[in-house]
């Protein structure tokens, strides 16, 4: 799959037609965090459930200063008509308005540039469609996380929200989040922080797990 972004790469400042008009990506993001997520096609079952859940969680992303934007190879007109189905799926008034815009990439220019095409899934003309990609960008416009799912597997937007919370926390504090971490759970002290410095940085206490190796690298502290 040509194109693509690596962690730390700056988001391209592309222009695109969307359901809220023409945008320039960096201007749209401003100083916010951003989630750019693609889906294979409008008017399809898995995509409808995904964007429905994304719409439900939009207030949670917004209060964390995260802007969302979707993308597929369908037209703006299709996006707007499909938005009615998404809102109806959510049990809401079937309007054309979603809490985030959807990009029209019917020429696949962005999908190719960003490495979003799924070679195993093709449209009626035999052309590959967009995979289920998630890119998370920081306020510096650099890629902080990427996830790539095939067309047959829907994403977990609650997990994407959890990841955002972790990324924002670890960007501000010298901690890491362990396996299955949830907001409010204890976090891990970075192994690069000396013991005495850790005591000053984390006044709520640092708790070290004793291990057979005798190495004191499993250090927990309450979430700052």
Curated annotation (Swiss-Prot):
GO cellular component, one term: cytosol
Positions carrying N6-acetyllysine: 63, 209
Disulfides per UniProt: none
Keyword Thylakoid assigned: no
Enzyme Commission number(s): 1.11.1.27, 3.1.1.4, 2.3.1.23
PTM annotation (N6-succinyllysine): residues: 209
Location(s) in or outside the cell: Cytoplasm; Lysosome
Domain Thioredoxin: 5-169
One MF term in the entry's GO annotations: phospholipase A2 activity
Entry keyword annotation includes Transcription regulation: no
Active site: 47 (cysteine sulfenic acid (-soh) intermediate), 140 (for phospholipase activity)
Cofactor note: Does not need Ca(2+) as cofactor.
Residue numbers of Phosphotyrosine PTMs: 89
Alphabetized UniProt keyword annotations: Acetylation, Antioxidant, Cytoplasm, Hydrolase, Lipid degradation, Lipid metabolism, Lysosome, Multifunctional enzyme, Oxidoreductase, Peroxidase, Phosphoprotein, Redox-active center, Transferase
Annotated region described as Required and sufficient for targeting to lysosomes and lamellar bodies, given as residue ranges: 31-40
PANTHER family: MCG48959-RELATED, PEROXIREDOXIN-6
Assembly information from the UniProt record: Homodimer. Interacts with GSTP1; mediates PRDX6 glutathionylation and regeneration. Interacts with APEX1. Interacts with STH. May interact with FAM168B. May interact with HTR2A.
Note: The active site is a conserved redox-active cysteine residue, the peroxidatic cysteine (C(P)), which makes the nucleophilic attack on the peroxide substrate. The peroxide oxidizes the C(P)-SH to cysteine sulfenic acid (C(P)-SOH), which then reacts with another cysteine residue, the resolving cysteine (C(R)), to form a disulfide bridge. The disulfide is subsequently reduced by an appropriate electron donor to complete the catalytic cycle. In this 1-Cys peroxiredoxin, no C(R) is present and C(P) instead forms a disulfide with a cysteine from another protein or with a small thiol molecule.
Family membership noted in the UniProt record: Belongs to the peroxiredoxin family. Prx6 subfamily.
Function: Thiol-specific peroxidase that catalyzes the reduction of hydrogen peroxide and organic hydroperoxides to water and alcohols, respectively. Can reduce H(2)O(2) and short chain organic, fatty acid, and phospholipid hydroperoxides. Also has phospholipase activity, and can therefore either reduce the oxidized sn-2 fatty acyl group of phospholipids (peroxidase activity) or hydrolyze the sn-2 ester bond of phospholipids (phospholipase activity). These activities are dependent on binding to phospholipids at acidic pH and to oxidized phospholipds at cytosolic pH.
Protein name in the entry: Peroxiredoxin-6
Organism: Bos taurus (Bovine)
Chain's gene name: PRDX6
